[in-house]
Amino acid sequence: MAPPMPLLSVRGSDGIQLVLGPPKFTDSETFQRDPSKNCKVSRFTKDGKLFGWCNGEVINIVNCSDSKLLHTLDLPKVVSLEFSPKNTILATWQTYTTGKDGTAGTPNLQLYDLKSGKISNVKSFIQKKMENWSPHWSDDENICARNVNNEVHFFENNNFDTIANKLHLQKVSDFELSPGEQPCKVAVYVPGSKGAPSFVRLYQYPNFSGPNSALANKSFFKADRVAMLWNSKATAVLVTASTDVDKTGASYYGEQTLHYIAVNGESAVVQLPKNGPIYDVTWNKNATEFCVVYGFMPAKATVFNLKCDPIFDFGTGPRNAAFYSPQGHILVLAGFGNLRGQMEVWDVKKYKLISKPTASDATFFSWCPNGEHIITATCSPRLRVGNGYKIWHYTGTLLHKYDVPANSELWQVSWQPFPDGVFPAKAIVYQAVPGDLPTQESKPAEAYRPPALRNKPVSSYKLHEDEPPQSMMPQSTEKPMSKTALKNQKKREAKKAAKQESKMDEPAESDSTNVQNNTPVAVNTGDPETDKKIKNLKKKLKAIEQLKELQSSGKTLEKNQIEKIQKEDILLKELEDLEIGV
């Protein structure tokens, strides 16, 4: 049986439409495009079976398989909607308003039953803030939770008339339910106050009382807000703690730290080698590793294991986001927003680079559920010009491109979701698949050069040195040597070093054919400053030769020693330029 073809919803100032995914890229034959210019919100259900949207007059809900209209709700002012995981409940939210005389407004958060045949309202709440407005359901819908007046209220089996449990701490600011099957776990965040630290605690529902009820606890002082991210197996949470102000003055955008908290009680601060903001944190589908993009530009990207040890370092580059494929076998590192849209597509198993496409001016990225295609889009209001979307194969081939008409805007694009297992992971290919569209982006305008420098060679000077990707795993798996073996190895190394020193002390041969003499004849230029530069360059080159000998003998060099070797060509060029000018 052929795998299904994911739909793509496209919402903008020209209305809303459903587009067939790869390989067709045509409008759905069954869905009738809604031309309303006021489509405020659209949403697929978690399993992708239903699709709903509000066009400024009514909410429509259709079946994705044949676009049959299932429900219509007369709710013209709705600006957000959400489906429960099993499509039992539809939650809608509209802006809270009070009466002209100051009287309390009507409930603006509505819950509707979609399973009873005829849609009906089951509960209404007052939810003043749009932030975190939607109730949180467990995947089996046995539990639903809301944050009400700094405490979490729990409902069971979608019975919203009775509060089954409450989680009350000092001031609960945010919470996250774990994914997956029962038992359900909840992570709660309480901000610090009056000198007390902020903290995140993990609980297992419904065990909220008692001194030992918390599964884990992590406190920290530098936190005005946090973002909590469960892994797919609900065994651990990553907490990105952020402050609004960086007291060190290193950044305008505050300070971030990353914390790891496991349900078995373990916790740790994830040590990031480079200073600067944390741009993105994402779990792999396998729940055993996560990727972090961090540091002042050019940013670093590193994969860590559950011990918070680095596995692989992707080096530095213009990036601020990371996206694992739904199957977890491919990782995309990208730089969107104020960056040029460069993407790096990596094979996660081999940590091998697959492709490096570029999506200029992109503000949105999403994997197709099949794990083979990705979409990049330029959406309003982030960018109001050049709106449109592109669909790529992960090998870097541009397969489809759509530009919205002039004076129109694109607001949202989203793939139709599918349950796990519908699209199994396929073998990764490195050869670009064929495509009809050119993938080459227009070259950016060259940097301005003053007239006096336009006929001179371009300097190779850089503000920073780019760091290459490297594995962070231990290089050797051999058993540790005994004390006697270590002693003998040290003796051999000392003997070898003494021998090399004695060789360097010997006078240089006068053979004119020996162009690689270790002690080249000193050049007297008559300029003390130039002589000093030449002497220093020769000293550095001599040290590099010694490092190369150690490397060829099998000794593992430090990172800074490898960087010195990589600069040999630059130093040789500088020395040549100085000696030519003599």
Swiss-Prot record:
WD repeats lie at residues 21-63, 73-124, 273-314, 358-402. Gene3D superfamilies: YVTN repeat-like/Quinoprotein amine dehydrogenase. Residues 510-522 have a biased composition (Polar residues). It comes from the Eukaryota. Signal peptide: none annotated. Residues 495-506 have a biased composition (Basic and acidic residues). One of its GO terms (molecular function) is ribosome binding. Residues 436-533 are annotated as: Disordered. This is Eukaryotic translation initiation factor 2A.
